[in-house]
Amino acid sequence: MNCEELTNKLTNFVLSKVGEANAKGVVLGLSGGIDSSLVATICVKALGKDNVLGVIMPEKNSNTQDKEHAELLANQLGIKYTVSDITDVLKSFGAGGYIPTKEFDKMADGNLKPRIRMCILYYFANKNNLLVAGTSNKSEIYMGYGTKYGDLGSDFLLIGNLFKTEVRELSKYLGVPDEIINKAPSAGLWEGQTDEKELGITYELLDKVLMAIEQNKEKEDISKELTVPIEKIEEILNRIESNKHKSQPIPIPN
């Protein structure tokens, strides 16, 4: 991967999208993770620090280290940022785990968090004539590891064509802090949650499988080449198929 060439391509993409929309810049959610850190870094490179706004959106169960890392990144880049705690919004919905009478529901309550955050980002976007820069990567998009009208809701997905392992490589090249690059990836949807635990496979291995699928290799060959059980390959293929709707336009009858 040619990091210099890729950086130029992505910065030009940001400039193009912002220019087409006659926007003043971009706003993005800063989670303290590698994806949002890389997107913020590239946007600053493209637009300058004064045209990038970061929004940190923790809630009462968020890992405090994530907020620290988000602020570390914002300060390193010199961008303005605001902190918008979503705990009270979750309570107003009656979300499980936020009021005493309800248990946390991973599907309903877990997905509510990124949807609230999307609304906040678009508020700041509309208020300041900014575009919302999405932070989902190619591995997540393939696996449907994102919330429809939540973190997948944005004006563009800058790293949507980069696998997670490529995100790591480019982040190192562009100077994203090591403590952000090296920590376990997590969507932060519930306490102790990590991407790889939930996906049941490391990103390093998953990306190799996804690249092989892109090359139209047979599942038996992928299993043999990567020493991955055929059942796991089938599980990944099924997950890709069942989550395609998250990346497709809303269905309209003919």
From Swiss-Prot:
ATP binds at residues 29-36, 135, 164, 186. It catalyses: deamido-NAD(+) + NH4(+) + ATP = AMP + diphosphate + NAD(+) + H(+). Deamido-NAD(+) binds at residues 115, 148, 155, 245-246. The keyword ATP-binding applies. Transmembrane segments: none annotated. Pfam families: NAD_synthase (PF02540). GO terms for cellular component: cytoplasm. Mg(2+) binds at residues 35, 140. Keywords: ATP-binding, Ligase, Magnesium, Metal-binding, NAD, Nucleotide-binding. Belongs to the NAD synthetase family. Catalyzes the ATP-dependent amidation of deamido-NAD to form NAD. Uses ammonia as a nitrogen source. Homodimer. HAMAP family: NadE_ammonia_dep. This is NH(3)-dependent NAD(+) synthetase. The lineage of its organism: Archaea, Methanobacteriati, Methanobacteriota, Methanomada group, Methanococci.
